[in-house]
Amino acid sequence: MFDKHVKTFQYGNQTVTLETGEIARQAAAAVKVSMGDTVVLVAVTTNKEVKEGQDFFPLTVDYLERTYAAGKIPGGFFKREGKQSEKEILTSRLIDRPIRPLFPEGFYHDIQIVAMVVSVDPEIDSDIPAMLGASAALVLSGVPFAGPIGAARVGYINGVYVLNPTKAELAKSQLDLVVAGTSKAVLMVESEAKILPEDVMLGAVVYGHDQMQVAINAINEFADEVNPELWDWKAPETNEELVAKVRGIAGETIKEAFKIRQKQARSAKLDEAWSAVKEALITEETDTLAANEIKGIFKHLEADVVRSQILDGQPRIDGRDTRTVRPLNIQTGVLPRTHGSALFTRGETQALAVATLGTSRDEQIIDALSGEYTDRFMLHYNFPPYSTGEVGRMGAPKRREIGHGRLAKRALLAVLPKPEDFSYTMRVVSEITESNGSSSMASVCGGCLSLLSAGVPLKAHVAGIAMGLILEGNKFAVLTDILGDEDHLGDMDFKVAGTTEGVTALQMDIKIQGITKEIMQIALAQAKEARLHILDQMKAAVAGPQELSAHAPRLFTMKINQDKIREVIGKGGETIRAITAETGTEINIAEDGTITIAATTQEAGDAAKKRIEQITAEVEVGKVYEGTVVKILDNNVGAIVSVMPGKDGLVHISQIAHERVRNVGDYLQVGQVVNVKALEVDDRGRVRLSIKALLDAPAREENAAE
């Protein structure tokens, strides 16, 4: 019934198994990948017919996590999985990025990849199995795909690279890097690091690429065994006559456009060139396919002009050489009521970054397959359409915005203070107000500045820079601080963030094969030069953390014995609610007895802290207290005196005065304030007090007689 094929190989410390022919047989190809107890089912479906008018490659990648994979039932009212989580979106992008450039130009057939996590080992992340499964399934589907690709996670522990580290190993690692590529070239890198030198980062990329050859060879052997039927697809031939016509109509205008340094004016000139082509070559009778072909030729001409100018040593689109960073403008404290803010402008790219400080209650609760955890630092990136001068829909953040925000967050994680040194929850929002290249790296710079503006004691300043590459044969140019057009028309997008001491985040997307280690080395060195230049200007604008904003909450931390937690909370929360209401504070109590008080003023925080100290304080024997009589006991036994909140003691009738007391009421009244001395605290916590001990003893009778 099943034509099942299985391939097993050792990958680092894990055993990987590829299976096909048993599940999802109606898909073009389906592969079940197991790595330890983590299992991912990847299915590829295709459309043999191209949709009418299609002029781009419609690749869709969806990575989905099923809660049953971890033996859990979804929360919420509907008890089923809902919209994609941030982890699902980021992993979908991770699969998409190295695969997309391996499809041939002109291939416009629908391809859908669905990677579904059906079993999860908490120690083994499902992203690497999902990437390997997508690679294998594409090869088995027979589509024109220049793969397979391999993927590897690389850690760096005690100076040694570790292949596919477990979650426990990653906790000790200075690096979390995912690299993907073919047998010949690296195509994608995504990483975060704890301020590592460039040579260590590059070494990790090379190490990961070397190690993934095992996976690539295994997928090739797997495909040879399955022997899939390959598509009979041929790339459309270039219509040289049509190319010549388009070049004749628009070639010179395109060249003129790319000499204009201002983005909007340049776009207007390119629109003028395209209008001339449309008017001359596209009529009402022209079918959509032919119109798309003409549009594609026009786009190729744009790319050829920009690329040839740069490789010939001419100035770039905006007049810069290959190593110059655009002019910078840095302002902080631009929004008066926010906790911290910065406006970071680099040429025609601008980010308004705003930092907000909160308490532990503001931490993000993340219900992951591996278990629930909280996150004290959030960075959200917004890319409104007006940032590029366009009209567009506003709505939920798109995959690109989620990815850019995650990259900027990774860049800043290494310099955040420890929770015990700075107990605030931190949120940074980066509003991209202008965009012409590398808005994610502007978010890194702006995010760092806004945190410093908010008074966050960062370990160091962090800056980011985006690099580009143009490669033709043996000629190449590495571009510092790329523009949007250079990003679209170039062969590599290479983003590096870090401090003066090293790299904190590295992201690389390569569109071609042939990027060597030497080219990556040059790009990293050039990026460091630019990063140090930006850091100098950032430090000149903000040398260190500013004073905490008057509008930010003040946090006060104290520690009490765990057995006192119940007293602070009170019956049904009565005591703690009373303290928060009276002082206007917010109080969080951890299980270990750590109390965090959030207040709008120093006075309110001190008042709440004093109340808690009073509740948790112990009565000390021999100490004198000012107390209030709260009750006169029956039968003339004595009186109960409150010496501190929740702490009462007995003043026995014999301890009221030196003389004989016949009636307690003659000496004490409810509400009366008296000074008492603590005589004893017994094993049950009962307190004996004395008023008499503080009174002068009467003179002896013989002394009186004299």
From Swiss-Prot:
Q: Do the record's keywords include Nucleotidyltransferase?
A: yes
Enzyme Commission (EC) number: 2.7.7.8
| Localisation | Cytoplasm
Q: Which residues form the S1 motif domain?
A: 622-692
Q: Which residues bind Mg(2+)?
A: D487, D493
| GO aspect biological process, one term | mRNA catabolic process
Q: Which cofactor does it need?
A: Mg(2+)
Keywords for the protein's UniProt record, in alphabetical order: Cytoplasm, Magnesium, Metal-binding, Nucleotidyltransferase, RNA-binding, Transferase
* Stretches assigned to the KH domain: 553-612
Q: What's the main place this protein lives?
A: cytoplasm
Q: Which GO terms describe its cellular component?
A: cytosol
Catalytic activity annotation: RNA(n+1) + phosphate = RNA(n) + a ribonucleoside 5'-diphosphate
Q: Which GO terms describe its molecular function?
A: 3'-5'-RNA exonuclease activity; magnesium ion binding; polyribonucleotide nucleotidyltransferase activity; RNA binding
InterPro entries tied to this protein: ExoRNase_PH_dom1 (IPR001247), ExoRNase_PH_dom2 (IPR015847), ExoRNase_PH_dom2_sf (IPR036345), KH_dom (IPR004087), KH_dom_type_1 (IPR004088), KH_dom_type_1_sf (IPR036612), NA-bd_OB-fold (IPR012340), PNPase (IPR012162)
Functional note: Involved in mRNA degradation. Catalyzes the phosphorolysis of single-stranded polyribonucleotides processively in the 3'- to 5'-direction.
Give the family, as the similarity comment puts it. Belongs to the polyribonucleotide nucleotidyltransferase family.
PANTHER family (alphabetical): POLYRIBONUCLEOTIDE NUCLEOTIDYLTRANSFERASE, POLYRIBONUCLEOTIDE NUCLEOTIDYLTRANSFERASE 1, MITOCHONDRIAL
Protein name in UniProt:
Polyribonucleotide nucleotidyltransferase
* Natural source organism: Neisseria meningitidis serogroup A / serotype 4A (strain DSM 15465 / Z2491)
